[in-house]
Amino acid sequence: MSQNQTQSRGPVDFAWQQPNGKQSDDYILEVKNLKQHFPIRSGFFQRVVGHTKAVDGVSFFLREQEVLGLVGESGCGKTTTGRSILRLYDPTDGEVWYRKANGERIDIVKITSNEMKPLRREMRMIFQDPFSSLNPRMTVRDIIGEPLIIHKVAKGRELEDRVAKLMSDVGLNPAYMRRYPHEFSGGQRQRIGLARTLSLNPRLIVADEPVSALDVSIQAQVLNLLQEIKDELGLTMLFIAHDLSVVEHICDRIAVMYVGKI
């Protein structure tokens, strides 16, 4: 099979259907009535005159080692949902229950920023735009290694060895780790972002339209890479996209979002 062709996974189920062979006690993520409302301000004193209901009562679950596709048109609240789950935005209301590696269930909405920090090792995000999500003043080594330094996982020679391994895992030559993002193509930049996401061995990944900014031929390569890594590492993934033809190749179930609701 050509590397520019996506691997077929067969038919997918919609979000309300139960995956075969799964038990109800293996949820890794359960979202209940999640709301994310942004204030609308007007006038000299910038008083709140209303709210934009970007996410308005969204509920779904995600099982261990499952890929759930969250699809919908632009502006429907998909990305905001993903960012709210990871607490990049503080949700207005609702519950986001996450089962940690030790089996403990915790409502992410109710914990503090300090309590959230260790969870960021288990919950990671792949950003949509490989051009703006990478710091142009940092080398690839620094970009991929930054999470390892922040969480005090590795430094020095061990850090370089880990970065080299991560680059190899995503199909990049480790000899290029001293280069800067502008020296890579769009597909290669997305692979750099993927390596950064995988650096802390996460259990849950929110992939925010990871191929929408890429050429069609490159999309297939990145999708196949995501599928291979998911199968090899046993990852759980919320895959956000606006194109059903993309999600059908990697997702087990699909949730369709429209004007802030599923």
PLM region descriptions:
Residues 95-118, 155:
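ABC ATPase NBD Q-loop/coupling interface
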Residues 103-104, 157-175:
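Conserved ABC ATPase "signature" region
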Residues 180-184, 188:
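Conserved ABC ATPase signature
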Residues 199-203, 219:
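A short, proline-enriched helix->beta-strand linker immediately N-terminal to the Walker B motif
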